[in-house]
């Protein structure tokens, strides 16, 4: 349980510190999602409930689809702007 909380905090820290690079922001969001999935799996195993394991598989599937869509948008953004860095004004 502490490991998943630690991973979630690493994801938040990565998201906050890398606000100019979209790829690192996407990776940080994925780390946060996978840490929550890991927490659900640990809770499911401790309560001996298979529903949590099914829900974890669903979360991993949605996270994969989210990554694919995000990277597709990122490719379109790169073609439009020529760079993937975010510039705040």
Swiss-Prot record:
Which Enzyme Commission numbers does its entry carry? 7.1.1.2
Q: Which family does it belong to?
A: Belongs to the complex I subunit 4L family.
The protein's matches in InterPro entries, at most eight in alphabetical order, are given as: NADH_UbQ_OxRdtase_chain4L/K, NUOK/Mnh_C1-like
Name of the coding gene: nd4L
Name the chemical reaction catalysed here: a ubiquinone + NADH + 5 H(+)(in) = a ubiquinol + NAD(+) + 4 H(+)(out)
Name where it's found.
Mitochondrion membrane
The membrane topology term of the UniProt record is:
Multi-pass membrane protein
Name where it mostly resides.
mitochondrion
- For the keyword Transmembrane helix, the answer is yes
Pfam families in UniProt: Oxidored_q2
Instruction: Give the source species.
Output: Aspergillus tubingensis
| Described purpose of this protein according to its UniProt entry | Core subunit of the mitochondrial membrane respiratory chain NADH dehydrogenase (Complex I) that is believed to belong to the minimal assembly required for catalysis. Complex I functions in the transfer of electrons from NADH to the respiratory chain. The immediate electron acceptor for the enzyme is believed to be ubiquinone.
Pull one GO CC term from this UniProt entry: mitochondrial membrane
Keywords attached to this entry: Electron transport, Membrane, Mitochondrion, NAD, Respiratory chain, Translocase, Transmembrane, Transmembrane helix, Transport, Ubiquinone
Q: Tell me where the transmembrane regions lie.
A: 1-21, 22-42, 55-75
Q: What is this protein called?
A: NADH-ubiquinone oxidoreductase chain 4L
* One GO MF term: NADH dehydrogenase (ubiquinone) activity
- What are the GO BP annotations of this UniProt entry? ATP synthesis coupled electron transport
NCBIfam families for this protein: PRK05715.1-2
What lineage is on file?
Eukaryota, Fungi, Dikarya, Ascomycota, Pezizomycotina
Please verify whether the record's keywords include Repeat. no
């Amino acid at each position: 349980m502490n490991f998943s909380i630690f991973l979630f905090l690493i994801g938040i820290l990565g998201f906050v510190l890398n606000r100019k690079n979209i790829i690192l922001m996407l990776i940080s969001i994925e780390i946060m999602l996978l840490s929550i999935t890991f927490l659900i799996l640990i809770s499911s195993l401790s309560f001996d409930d298979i529903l949590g394991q099914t829900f974890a598989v669903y979360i991993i599937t949605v996270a994969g689809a989210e990554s694919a869509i995000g990277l597709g948008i990122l490719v379109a953004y790169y073609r439009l702007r020529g760079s993937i860095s975010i510039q705040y004004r």
